[in-house]
Amino acid sequence: MIIVFLTLSTFYIALLLLQPALPQPFMALFKTLPIGLLIVMVLKARSQLQNRTFITLLLALSFSALGDVLLALDTGQLFIGGLAAFFVSHGFYIITMLPIKNWRLDVVLLYLFLAIIVFCLFYPNLNEMLIPVLFYMLVLTIMASFTWMTDKSNGFLVLGGAVFVISDSILGLNRFYLEIAHADIAIMGSYYLAQFCLVKGFLQATSKHK
């Protein structure tokens, strides 16, 4: 399953180098295939997952796939739809990590500090995107922080949260601050790694608690 995931992820990233050779709908399809495989991984692990974890993971990945499609088809107007889809996705990841019992103020402050720095760079160019981006950064910060504090916490979860922050920071900087060479490669490579680590982390945590 890991080999297939790596193959699908690498294939899409390679396709990015060919743009605009493929029409947007095809790019959107290939973009979502690695996330579709993660959904299959969760479905195969159904017997080892609690009902809430199973449902919230499926919803988190499904909204991620929707966000992928909207961003792949983005002509400007669909960006906020993609942002909203990922906002909901992070919300379901957060629910999956509840309850939080091991509060870590140092982790929260670190992620808040990083979010403030990045937001200050975005701010002059956000305009009507100010509120949506602010709320998205807040939920992303909470999700990444919770990977340290949930009783399901493990190396995969922590890495997944951190790499998701890196991926979205590159995306935001490229869109709202300055154009970054080969940003799409860096964004998608880190994004696929983050999603894989989050799913792997949740599945590993569930196995550990059985």
Indicate where each model-derived feature is located:
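Polytopic alpha-helical membrane-helix bundles and their juxtamembrane interface segments
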Residues: M1-K210
